[in-house]
Amino acid sequence: QTDAGLWEFRNLSQHHCYTYLFHWAGSLAAEKIAKVLKDEKMGKLAQKLGKNAKNKIEQCYSASKKGYSQAIGTDRMDASCLQLINMNYLDNNSDRAKAHLKAMEKELKASNGLFYRYKHQDDFGEPETTFLICAFWYVEALACVGRLDEAIEYFDNIVGYSNHVGLLSEDVNEKDG
């Protein structure tokens, strides 16, 4: 079933990669619970859900971009797909994880080192601001694939956007901070 996705698009219902990532994560948790409860039926259902979720996630892979896209049937990149690395869907040592991260950087990384959620037009036009949660996901993904020095550098950059009491806003304009 299609949905509005993490970013709650008002006029765009798709099969979002992020949604299926959480189906996959939920299936892993359900498998663990089934083992503890010795519930074979639950275990089989969890495995079925996990297999279906993996299938849907893989349909989001864009061979041309060497990364996972926002949804099935589109090549649009979405920073929420950084979570494929952070949640260990992708093996962090794999070429695919590293290529996916590079694709994300190429498409969504701003000149100030922060990250856009996505770059395509939405209900309000083309995005003008980066989202700080995406920058934190980026830092985590860098650390996961072993790019620790860069992770520290970008984390320090993000902290620089806090106000006098250490609070961060949801978004930051790339041009004027």
What are these regions (language model features)?
Residues 20, 24-27, 47, 54:
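Hydrophobic, well-ordered secondary-structure segments
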Residues 7-21, 41-44, 72, 126:
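Alpha-helix capping and helix-loop boundary segments enriched in small/acidic/polar residues
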Residues 22-39, 83-93, 136-150:
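Well-ordered alpha-helical scaffold segments within catalytic/enzyme domains
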Residues 2-10, 29-48:
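Inter-helical turn/loop segments and adjacent helix faces that build the functional surface
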Residues 34, 41-44, 64, 68, ...:
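Secondary-structure transition/capping residues
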Residues 14-25, 75-79, 129-136:
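Aromatic- and histidine-enriched alpha-helix N-cap/loop-to-helix transition segments
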